[in-house]
Amino acid sequence: MKKFFTLLLAVISTMTAFAQTEPAIELQAEVDGNTRTLTIGLGVEGTVQIDWGNGEKVTSEVIPAFDGWNQVNVSGTVSGEGKVKIYGDNIVCFECSSTVKGAKVLSLDVTKATALKDLTANTNKLTAIDLTKNTELEKLTISNNQLTSIDISKCTKLTTLDITNNLLTAIDITKNQALQTLRIGLNKFAGELDLSTNPTIKSVYAQINELTAVKIGNNTASKPTFSFNENKLTSFDATGIEDAANAILYLNGNQLTEIKLPSTKMKTLNILKNNFTLATLPAPTVAKTFNYAPQNNYVIAESYKVGDVLDLSSQTSATLNTQFAVYKSDKTALTEGTDYTVADGKITFLTAQEAVYVTMSSALYSKFTGTSIYKTTGTKVEGSTDINAVTAQGVKISTAGNEISISGLSQGDAVTVANLGGAVVANFHANSSNAHVQAAKGLYIVSINGKAIKIAL
């Protein structure tokens, strides 16, 4: 029996010695003569040896068994060709992050460190990494690198993935059902991000990409947070978020015109700088904290003529009760009744202006105020022809006494005559080529089939 145990110890000793001849982790680093630090955690108490590039193995101090917090920093100076080798068994935590101005890690091989649970390699120059042997990995943080692709299909225990600020265009997380936190911001992700196969994912940060669609699916996570700021989304469906009352959703800086929300009031909804209008914004009660102002400007034509009508009637209603005002580009207010009129959301321009815009405000959406006011794009109001002008349809308008005469009408032409206060004097469809309207002295807007002109009696 004694001989058996002696033999067993010899075998174990031989195996350990053999294991130590093969590095568990290898990395290629830039050589700048400065000290750099590696952070290591072991599954059981022990030591590691590190060859910093000169062929000599330096034994670390005793490293306690890793409990999630007690990893040990090991420092040295990279030399030679920058090939650093880490020897040791049961390495469960490893970090080789670099400083912004310091020397970087160029490549990293962890295929033999199969016990790894926590790997961090931020702010380096990694273009690829093989994780196919790291099936125990639970946390991967590898932001600020140059990765163009990554395969995490074998990392089925992964709960946290941070690959922020790389060059990635796509990622497959269908095999990562344990994933709770996903950080993929500042990449080049395009097309659709499908999260429907990960119903328990709790936090997703995918800001500053080129995503055109996101599929949430039925999300059952408690207190979920989703950030898709600064993408190219035009619509969004959040109806599958079960814990809506505690959900946070950021969609700022997209191209949204439509959003579907849970029936339950959300905790936070941010949709600033999208293409919503007063008519398409969600109700102000959809979230406890709802930030929607400013929005992208409402796009109108680049130019109008005096007498033309800008129809913004879609942006008002009995509920909205929208207030309209016109300003020059220097923010000087124009005078209603002199420079323009407003009637049911239709603005008629009365004077030529080099550059103006229209503001729209509603008590229902009170955050549209100050620099965050909802407004149109800029436009130019060009001078119109005189009283006896011939319109584009060949219609001639003239005045005499208290009568406005219109000739050259076609059967069925829609004719409206209104004063500058918006009061309609006449409204009819032509049944002959000539029409006459009696009115008191003053300024009027004559509109024919939507084209208008200012005249004076």
Where are these predicted regions, by residue range?
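N-terminal capping/linker segments that flank leucine-rich repeat
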Residues: 2-8, 12-118, 283-383
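Leucine-rich repeat
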Residues: 90, 112-116, 133-138, 146, ...
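Right-handed parallel beta-helix
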Residues: 93-145, 154, 162
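Canonical leucine-rich repeat
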Residues: 94, 108, 129, 150-152, ...
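Conserved hydrophobic beta-strand positions in leucine-rich repeat
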Residues: 94-96, 117-121, 138-142, 159-163, ...
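Leucine-rich repeat domain C-terminal region
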Residues: 224-226, 230, 247-257, 263-311, ...
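C-terminal outer-membrane/trafficking sorting elements
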Residues: 386-457
